[in-house]
């Protein structure tokens, strides 16, 4: 049981890091910090296609990570 949960946790961590790195950045870097990012406030686009899929997959993988960590702490593994 311990080995299974640990393997699932490692796979989930690798998948979560990969999905987060595949997502497109939402900031303009330093220029966005200086200008205050006002153009993003009024020109916000809805996520579509692969961006929406990656966003939802990040949420699912995060919930799985949270549940696996609760399981590890509950069972004292």
Swiss-Prot record:
Keywords: Cell membrane, Membrane, Protein transport, Translocation, Transmembrane, Transmembrane helix, Transport. GO terms for molecular function: protein-transporting ATPase activity. One of its GO terms (biological process) is protein transport by the Sec complex. The chain crosses the membrane at residues 2-22, 57-77. One of its GO terms (cellular component) is plasma membrane. Its main location: membrane. Disulfide bonds: none annotated. It is found in: Cell membrane. It is a multi-pass membrane protein. InterPro entries: SecG. Involved in protein export. Participates in an early event of protein translocation. Belongs to the SecG family. This is Probable protein-export membrane protein SecG. It comes from Staphylococcus saprophyticus subsp. saprophyticus (strain ATCC 15305 / DSM 20229 / NCIMB 8711 / NCTC 7292 / S-41). The lineage of its organism: Bacteria, Bacillati, Bacillota, Bacilli, Bacillales.
């Amino acid at each position: 049981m311990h080995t299974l949960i640990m393997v699932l946790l490692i796979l989930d961590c690798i998948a979560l890091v990969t999905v987060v790195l595949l997502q497109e950045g939402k900031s303009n870097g330093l220029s966005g910090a200086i200008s205050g990012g006002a153009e993003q406030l009024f020109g916000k686009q809805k996520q579509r296609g692969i961006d929406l899929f990656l966003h939802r997959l990040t949420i699912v993988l995060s919930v799985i990570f949270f549940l696996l960590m609760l399981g590890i702490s509950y069972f004292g593994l």
